Amino acid sequence: MSQFTSSYDPTSFEARLYAAWEAAGHFKPSGTGQPYTILLPPPNVTGTLHMGHAFQQTLMDALVRYHRMCGDDTLWQVGTDHAGIATEMVVSRNVVLEGHGETRDSLGRDGFINKVWEWKQQSGDTIERQMRRLGVSADWSRSTFTMDPQPSAAVTEAFVRWYEAGLIYRGQRLVNWDPVLKTAISDLEVENVAEEGMLWSIRYPLSDGVTYEHVEHDAAGNEILRETRDSLIVATTRPETLLGDTAVMVHPEDRRYTALIGKTVTLPLTGRHIPVIGDAYVDPTFGTGVVKVTPAHDFNDYQIGLRHRLPMIQVLDDAACIVSKTSIQSGMPSGATSDTTNTPSDPEASSAANQHDTLVMPAHLAGLDRYAARKQILADLDAQGLLVAAIPHTLQVPRGDRTGQVIEPYLTAQWFVKMETLAARGLALVERGAVTFVPPNWINTYRHWMENIQDWCISRQLWWGHRIPAWFDTQGGVYVGRSEAEVRAKHALGPEVTLTQDNDVLETWFSSQLWPFSTLGWPDPTAMAEHGYARYLPSSVLVTGFDIIFFWVARMIMATDHFTGNVPFHDVYITGLIRDAQGQKMSKSKGNVLDPLDIIDGITLDDLVAKRTTGLMQPKLAEKIAKATRKEFPEGIAPHGADALRFTIAALATHGRDIKFDLGRAEGYKNFCNKLWNATRFVLMNTADDTAHSPAQHQAGQDGQDAPRTPQPRTDAEQWILSRLTAITAEAHAQFAAYRFDLLAQALYEFAWNEFCDWFVELAKPALNSDDTQAAASTRHTLLYVLETLLRLLHPLIPFITEELWRQVAPRLGIQATTLMLRPYPQPQQLETAAFANAAADVEWLKIMVSALRRIRSTLNVPPSRRVSLLLQGDQEVDRRRITHFATALHFLLKLEHIDWLGADSAAPPSATAIVGTLKLLVPLEGLIDVDAERVRLDKEIKRVESEIDKSNGKLSNAVFVQNAPAAVVEQERSRLTEWTTQLNGLRERRATL
């Protein structure tokens, strides 16, 4: 047993305890019991722990620790993601910063990848070290990196199988394109930002001198304009893509333009004739009701182009500059099947069958950046009298989350997965309950995405990642296989056939979707047996955020179903998004990010300011952020310890969409830990000579571990606390099952702070100080027993302090086990219902009595050592019985000189008064306080009780409440009103005597 310090200092034991747990192998699966598995959403290997990580990992760890204590065979599968784009950016920047004159491109693919592995070896485990500081009890020996050989083999296998099943194809499609990284990116990597822009109106002349009668009507249908026009006025926010227009579009029921559908207009600056088409996509009320259609540069236009079989003209290159020439591609969707003879190897070849003409761009525009091209095109339009108007307009601008650059819809050859069949099965699994969402409303989000799914672009133009297992010959034929050797053998390709592997890699989500089973050895049977594939799949629960329900959760369900015939997990617990105390999203640019390690270990103000202002994408914000930080944290952030942060997270974990993190809550829960520490010191000091360590005081538990003897209570206070302990134990199990960590934390907090620390410790003092040695011994044992049980109840949420305290308490109960984390989680005890219920009711009455009299003492500023007299008036037999029964406790707890009863008609001296039910409590004021002050106190109390009566009357006069609330609740409210009314009458009567 280590030395027990007098004050709570988490720095003195948290790191020590974690190292001991890990060294002893306590985090590893036991191999016995019911399997309980949790998958950690693998954080980026480039990353550091942020509040979102800390939030989810705390809840996961609580579940794992709880189920481990329940005897389950727990596996928390952890690992990191190779994070293709993020890692490539970090290492590319580092290569330049090393100052050797090297760049990513100068190193070449192999040299650069070697640099990435070097970097990963040096700093790739940062986030796992930080997770340990939080208390994550994962089996680190099974930590997996998505680029490790086993998961890499799984990626190749999955790609080949899907390709052979006809689910993967290569085709020309529109994708999100980052012109800085020069790669396709996923929707999740695109942030739509509201920005101020312009809406330009451009005149598109009708072909061949055609004119039409343009008529406008107001909302009532009255004609307000009629004129002959020879052009259509098109509204657009992107004039730089005008060169790629292949139609203009109106709503088919817009009376202004219906006669023009099927006609053509002359595309400005080009002389090309493009059709006027009708499509219900158009909003007739937006702009002029006429929009340009540029299928190669807008996602909505792309779909419209497919519907109307419009040509597609790509006018921007991969750097978002105007091309010098381009091909007109037909409006047929491009994409090869799994036939290994017809999939081309590059964008030019992939659409060869769909090309029928070549366009040369205006020479003065070729090579211009898109924004320079916009400026020039607008100038050209204005010079030709075709620019009608430009008005300010707020629009959603898609920006890459890595580079901050505006993302371009870009037509390029990529690899895709056909999703329709996979999605139908994935949706059916959830609909029939094979996978359950918590809270259940998130199934609607899942359903919406699955019912509106598009084929998935899985290729990325990067070097770091899983290289696509496809090889091209010189004729553009593609061959997919697990290796080049397999490809050559399967297709009888001799050495004279030159094969070149695809340069692209698979997007990170492709490997992440295999996480539930690739981490368990799939597809290698030997590895599967070693990793417990059959035992640990499906996992029990996935804890994740709502923002990746589609990108990760849905894909895991689909992939696991297809490749294993199983579901990846039974439950999906969706957490909210952590925001700051004002409800704002935490972001570097806002300067409101909180680092969980700074909350745990503390940080000086200067270091905090430096952390928040370094590396800003907008350096001009630094001064504002520094000023706000100094105002909010004038002393920096004090260390709170891991437990205080964890308990804060649990308490905040509602089932809502957004969660406001307030550092003040962490301070409050640090105080809670301190309260628990001091209560334990009290118990230990008062049980130092106890005999609880003798063999008679403990018994063998059902699991073979030593278990403390169940108390045989000799006092009402013991019976009360044991009944409350049983109730709180049952509630803890229920809240864990419901993933209601907030209600769990609240219940345990109330029990620990109010019922155990504040009340039972106080109520135990009379017995501990009495001459009744049996009652004293029983109380000491119950103190230890309840405290030890409470520490076990709290352990999943606050593992460090509970372990440290338990190691002091356990020996007093004769427990031989060496660690709390492997002790059984408490189970509700079977109590003698009637006896315990009666004792509990009596103690609740005693608590009210003590509280009422302490309020009087506090209000009157009576010194704690000053003894007072208590006069009682009332005719309830139960009150007289309780007063007699608890006389010793009342004298001890309230510093009473004596207790006397007054007759109903007896005149009482001037007294401070309180009412408990029908019992009137009077503390004579003579020599105690100023009578005027007592009048003020009574007036205040009368107002308080009147307010409570108003609340009850309000409820009972509400027909909806009376009709819909359970009868017991309504009756309880009526009883409460009666009690308040009785109290008010007594208070007014007493006030009248002063």
From Swiss-Prot:
Give residues annotated as binding ATP. Answer: K588
Question: What residue intervals hold the motif 'HIGH' region?
Answer: 43-53
Q: Which domain of life is it from?
A: Bacteria
Alphabetical list of SUPFAM superfamilies matching this protein: Anticodon-binding domain of a subclass of class I aminoacyl-tRNA synthetases (SSF47323), Nucleotidylyl transferase (SSF52374), tRNA-binding arm (SSF46589), ValRS/IleRS/LeuRS editing domain (SSF50677)
Tell me, what's a Pfam family for it?
Val_tRNA-synt_C
Please tell me whether the keyword Transmembrane is annotated for this protein: no
A molecular function GO annotation: aminoacyl-tRNA deacylase activity
Subcellular localization, per the record?
Answer: Cytoplasm
Motif range for 'KMSKS' region? 585-589
Q: Where do the record's region annotations for Disordered lie? A: 329-355, 692-714
Alphabetical keyword list: Aminoacyl-tRNA synthetase, ATP-binding, Coiled coil, Cytoplasm, Ligase, Nucleotide-binding, Protein biosynthesis
Please explain the role this protein plays, according to its UniProt record.
Answer: Catalyzes the attachment of valine to tRNA(Val). As ValRS can inadvertently accommodate and process structurally similar amino acids such as threonine, to avoid such errors, it has a 'posttransfer' editing activity that hydrolyzes mischarged Thr-tRNA(Val) in a tRNA-dependent manner.
Extract the NCBIfam families matched here. Answer: PRK05729.1, valS
Report what the protein is called. Answer: Valine--tRNA ligase
What's the source species for this entry?
Xylella fastidiosa (strain 9a5c)
